[in-house]
Regions:
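A conserved helix-loop-strand patch within extracytoplasmic ligand-binding domains
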Residues: 107-166, 251, 270-274
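C-terminal motif of bacterial Sec signal peptides marking the signal peptidase cleavage site
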Residues: 15-20
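Bacterial signal peptide processing site
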Residues: 22-25
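Bilobed "Venus flytrap"/periplasmic-binding protein-like clamshell domains
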Residues: 33-68, 133-205, 289-293
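Beta->alpha turn/N-cap motifs
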Residues: 70-71, 81-94, 112-113, 143, ...
Length: 306
């Protein structure tokens, strides 16, 4: 949930420690120190913990600088070397870095968007590593009962039923290409009615639970999906831009390393499914678990740390 994009906070000065930590056994070169940063909301903190802990478990000295503010504060900190690694979102970051789309524009394809993003990052001496399957973008959900009674698993499954269903979402949804307008143009879905609510917030959740709407727009990594047992419908015709999660790293750090940092961070992305991310978000946001504990448990479950 890129809610951090809309929150503003002052960024304190970050002291960069340049000295390398001790080498590993066997006479290999010393490992560079690493500073992992994040914007200011719980999903980012958990992702920052995942990156930090897998590096720490492999002998890296890591400084955590989380909750630094919105992207327009944190991205410059990454460029300038105040932090080295930042969890990011492909399509959103590409649109932020290349606002005019002169270098590349986000697409619905993860690989294409990654390629375009890398071209945009080259000037800032940054590298985007492998993206996870997990996303944080517009999603459409139904209750478990609705999904079960109508055998709904993907958005295209709504085709026989949409004419008798009510769609809920933000007031601008009917005219937005990634909301009702897109559902009509890409999926051929026309709903019986539309109920203006919020952007996947408590109004939408309550309307789904109260059967005031049949389909609701909720961000794909929102903790309510797990907490309320909603079914996130697969975007099988790729309506949404590819806002997959991926670590962005300073080239200067990668050049000091022997490839281990890249390999370790890519191993996190390879295991991070939508369901896994949503479960961690629910634990941290709803159950109020410590993101450090949640991240450690997930890394151990995936066999990435001992």
């Amino acid at each position: 949930m890129k809610r951090g994009n809309f929150l503003f906070a002052a960024l304190v000065a970050i002291a960069v420690v340049a000295s390398a930590c001790g080498g590993t056994g066997g006479g290999t070169a010393s490992k560079p120190d690493v500073i992992v940063g994040s914007t200011n909301f719980y999903e980012q903190t958990t992702l920052g913990e995942l990156y930090s802990q897998i590096l720490e478990a492999n002998g890296y000295k890591v400084t955590k600088k989380f909750n630094l503010g919105p992207r327009d504060i944190v991205y410059p900190a990454l460029k300038s070397g105040q932090i080295d690694i930042l969890p990011e979102y492909l399509a959103t970051l590409l649109a932020f870095v290349d606002k005019d789309g002169k270098i590349a524009k986000p697409t619905t394809d993860k690989k294409e968007t990654t390629t375009g993003l890398q071209k945009a990052l080259d000037a800032d001496q940054l590298t985007v590593l492998d993206a996870a399957d997990a996303t944080d973008q517009n999603g459409f959900v139904v209750t478990k009962d609705t999904a079960s009674s109508k055998s709904l698993k993907k958005i295209s499954d709504l085709a026989p039923y949409a004419k008798d269903m009510i769609l809920g979402g933000p007031a601008e949804c009917p005219t937005r290409p990634f909301c009702a307008l897109g559902l009509k143009n890409v999926y051929g879905l026309t709903f019986k009615d539309f109920k203006p609510l919020d952007v996947g917030g408590p109004l939408t959740v309550a309307a789904l639970e109260g059967k005031q709407i049949d389909v609701g727009l909720i961000l794909t990594s929102d903790p309510s999906i797990v907490a309320k047992g909603f079914v996130l419908l697969d975007d099988d015709k790729h309506l949404q831009l590819a806002d997959n999660l991926a670590p962005v790293v300073r080239n200067a750090l990668l050049q000091k390393d022997d490839g281990t940092i890249k390999r370790l961070l890519n191993s996190v992305s390879a295991k991070l499914s939508q369901a896994e991310l949503n479960d961690m978000n629910k634990q941290v946001s709803v159950d109020k678990a410590d993101s450090k504990v949640v991240a450690a448990a997930w890394l151990k479950k995936q066999g990435l740390i001992k």
